[in-house]
Amino acid sequence: MRHRKSGRQLNRNSSHRQAMFRNMAGSLVKSELIKTTLPKAKELRRVIEPLITLAKQDSVANRRLAFARTGDKEVVGKLFNELGPRYEERPGGYIRILKCGFRTGDNAPMAYVELVDRPEVEEVVETEDAAAE
């Protein structure tokens, strides 16, 4: 029976799962938008939300906890220097999961995972004058 067993197994052993979510959390913090399968996205929420909540209070102890969970100094730096202050007033719900169709090949449901309130990247539109020069 699986009573009181939380979390998804995702057909992986525990060390593989832990490494996968550590890498996914790092990728999400660095790029602020990733594409993955829907079950992985839903499970990633359980990893990244407590990390951002931890980053709201900058202390050596919290930085060490975040490093223990991510294993990357660059990720910890961005968490505490950018994301913590950005979400200071938000009481949770730091990521958004958007369904984006199905993967070619195995038809797995795919989703975008993005940080809420992330800065919009403006696309550069070339005009005819700029293209001529």
From Swiss-Prot:
One Pfam family here: Ribosomal_L17
Keyword Membrane: no
Record's keyword terms, sorted: Ribonucleoprotein, Ribosomal protein
PROSITE patterns for the chain: RIBOSOMAL_L17 (PS01167)
GO BP terms, alphabetized: translation
SUPFAM superfamilies: Prokaryotic ribosomal protein L17
Keyword Disulfide bond carried by entry: no
Coiled coil (UniProt feature): none
Binding partners and assembly: Part of the 50S ribosomal subunit. Contacts protein L32.
Family membership noted in the UniProt record: Belongs to the bacterial ribosomal protein bL17 family.
HAMAP family according to UniProt: Ribosomal_bL17 (MF_01368)
This protein's name: Large ribosomal subunit protein bL17
Biological source species: Pseudoalteromonas atlantica (strain T6c / ATCC BAA-1087)
